[in-house]
Amino acid sequence: SNSLSSLSARNSSRVRGSSFGESQSGLSPFSIDQRVSTSFHRQMTSSNLLKIYHDVLEHHLSCWVAETTCPYQVVKIATPEWSASWTNRILHRTIRLDHVAQSCKLLYLTPSEKKAASNALNLAVSAFATQWAQGSVRARRKYSTTSQGPNDSGAVINMMEDFDRTLQHYFWSQAHRALSDVAELDCYQVACAELIFSLAQRPWQPETPDQSPAYETPSAESIRSHVQSIIERDGPPIYSERAARRMHTLKFRCDSYNKGLGLKSKNLKHGIASMAREDRDTIGLLYWLAIMFDTVAASMYERPVVVTDEECRYEVQRDVVPLCDTNLPYRWDYEIFLQTSGEVSHRTSWPCSYDRAAEDVTRSAPVKVLLFRHVSYLQNALRKSSAPHQLEDIVFNTMLIYDYWNRTHGQFFKELVQDFVNVPQRIRGWFICISAHWHLAVLMLADLLDFIDENHLGLEGARNERSALCMIARLREDSCRELSDLGHVATLPTYLSTPSEDSPEFHHAVTEGTILTEPWTMILIRAFSQASVFFLERAKGLCDFRATSGFVCEFKTSLKEAENCIKALWLLGKKSDMAWDLAEALQQALR
């Protein structure tokens, strides 16, 4: 778009100024000198930032937010962008939707407000993309089983001087400020900017050797709490919550105007009706994206969803009669949501055609969201001290989703892992990320079930059945092992595969491993951290049974599986300070 094509010029004017003497937390548009400005044009141009955004976020949004799977979509005839070439679809359609909404009098924006919204979106894209800046010492370092420790003084000094780190702090600070300036402005560009910025982890300020705490090898008993303390440094999902609330407000306004409510002119209804089909569909796609982010973030951070079930009922659910024996009459039902009877008449098997594989992976995305939504139901029911039969009802429906996954997408994904080198690059990125998200939700579910059974909160019969089947232990072990397998293949450099004629040319910043194409880093951090701790604790437990014949084999296997997960975190650490610290801590525990 024109607004984004001028990003380089705008940033050029921002970074040109006097000497860079202020703290990074208080950067102003004129606080970076000519040296930095020149280096910016040499190392990190506007086209590079947009290329990274395109190769990471839009690459995944073409799978996550498809017309064929959007529950708020009526027309499903759009051609999916599954090929080796794709556009910045969501970005372009968001910008267009704001223009169309203004012409239909759905939005009232002054010229200065339009400029502020566009600026916020540009800066959110830049803040997101600079996470993949590859000039720092840390980004160039190769993986080794011998940790150098996170507080190596030389590395810290270099990190503080590295230009890419300056860019990360600068753009995060500028995007944060720009979004604060438009906090009261309801439009689609602001909501989209908030969604994008919610994925940009705030760069941490490096600690000097004198300020940083002594780095000691944690014991096996303390590693879980040590990992949790690092993860807790991440703040609440404020921007995804703001985006969900804003997107819900905009959809509420559109639905009201479409029915003739709140119109300031009788001619407005005709304006909405004359909106192009694609633009009306964009409203549904963006709303689904916001609900998806809200659902995953709410369960992951143990917070209430912004948009309740009753407020975000999907199209095919509107005619469903509410149940009379539940406090959540509009709870998402998996058979209705997925438009399936639960019976699996056909399962995709690998090898298969590219389109068939892409369709299967795309259809798995809503199943993942549905599981996170049910994890949230269980969290809320426990907070409310719901009756045992209500808890078991949620558990039963959640396990239906789990079983459905294992009979369909789960089996297909295992086959993709086994033949990973022959899987097309875009399919790799899609299924690796969705699968890792799924397994994090399963691990969260296992923790909740453990809490229910340990505290005798559910029904005795159901508790005894879970105990007899070792269900909770199986949930944890299966998901952790699959995460280990994912960590192994997702850290293989993409250049090891034989490229086909239709292989996309990804930006070099994401070619060191498929895992680097993940846009929502926090999900993978939590998933691989939990799996790492699981295997390290298992290895520690095996030490108590050294006399058994299978000790050596099982012990080595546990350590190898832990290392697969730690390496995944280490590679994520090239763009995430949190992942870097976790990889260092877990690697110390591994030794």
Show the residue positions of the predicted features:
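Structural signature of alpha-solenoid helical repeat junctions
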Residues: L121, Q189, D279-T282, L286, ...
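Amphipathic alpha-helical repeat scaffolds of TPR domains
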Residues: L123-A124, F128, L185-E207, V369-F372, ...
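Acidic, Ser/Thr- and Gly/Pro-rich intrinsically disordered linkers and low-complexity segments
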Residues: I77-S112, S256-D281, I336-D355, F413-I427, ...
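Transcriptional activation interfaces
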Residues: S3-R177, A183
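Acidic, Ser/Thr-rich, low-complexity intrinsically disordered regions in fungal proteins
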Residues: A127-C352, V417-Q418
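Hydrophobic core segments within long, regular secondary-structure runs in both alpha-
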Residues: N122, S126, S147, R165-S180, ...
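Long, internal scaffold/assembly segments composed of regular secondary structure
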Residues: L328-F431
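Fungal C-terminal regulatory tails
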Residues: F413-F431, V442-R591
